[in-house]
Amino acid sequence: MTLLEIIIVLGIIGTIAAGVVVLAQRAYDSKAMTDLVTNTNTIRTAIKETYGPTGIYPNEQVAGTLALTDATINTVAGANIPPIAQLVQLGKLSTSEAKNNISSNYFNIGNAHVGTAGVAAGATAIGDRAYFIEVNGLDQKQCRNIMLQVGNQWDYVEVHNTAGSSGAYASGDHLNLQAAAVTGGNGAGGVVRSLADTGNVLITPGLANGFCSDSAANSLVLGSR
């Protein structure tokens, strides 16, 4: 075999190897997305089973949720126990189901309300008859794809396109699921879908492409009654 033939063979091998690496990375990314979507659905069921009978959903505990580890999630206690830890300790979730495998944080859970009718002025907890899950640490493609996959199954979808990176949560507690939706554009953040009169929109690829910044600081908030 001549030197030229050796070079050609090595070039072919290198091209094949590069293709295999790309395919392997895509397969890994696809599995990570599938696992994350599955976990959000599992958590949604656990929340309804646990808090649905009373209709009163827990306050979010951002600092406590971010501080959780695989060991402490089974032992943390007290009045301010993170909702996700409470679900694990009740046997509603496994630790792997409770974790966002992309950001490596446990899912943030908090309460929400629908409108403000009949609420005393200045109240901080307005009904608490609804809830949300926040998924953080998403890049632009992950944020848009998860929104497309699950968004239309939820009453409320909101994008935080900054401050939602791994190790942080951007959503406040006591969300109003009747907040007005925005149209998006240029990687925007904001309410995509809601229970407002004009908020029950169908999330299409075109709509999703107007949200989520070109960074890994996106978080997706999914709310329901």
Tell what function each PLM region has.
Residues 50-90:
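Short, glycine/small-hydrophobic-rich surface segments
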Residues 91-224:
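Intrinsically disordered, low-complexity regions enriched in Pro/Ser/Thr/Gly and acidic residues
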Residues 41-44, 48, 144:
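Predominant activation on well-ordered alpha-helical scaffold segments within soluble catalytic domains
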Residues 30, 46, 50-53, 149-156:
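Structured segments of extracytoplasmic/periplasmic soluble domains
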Residues 5-14, 71-79, 222-225:
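Charged, low-complexity, helix/coiled-coil-prone segments
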Residues 1-44:
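N-terminal single-pass transmembrane signal-anchor helix
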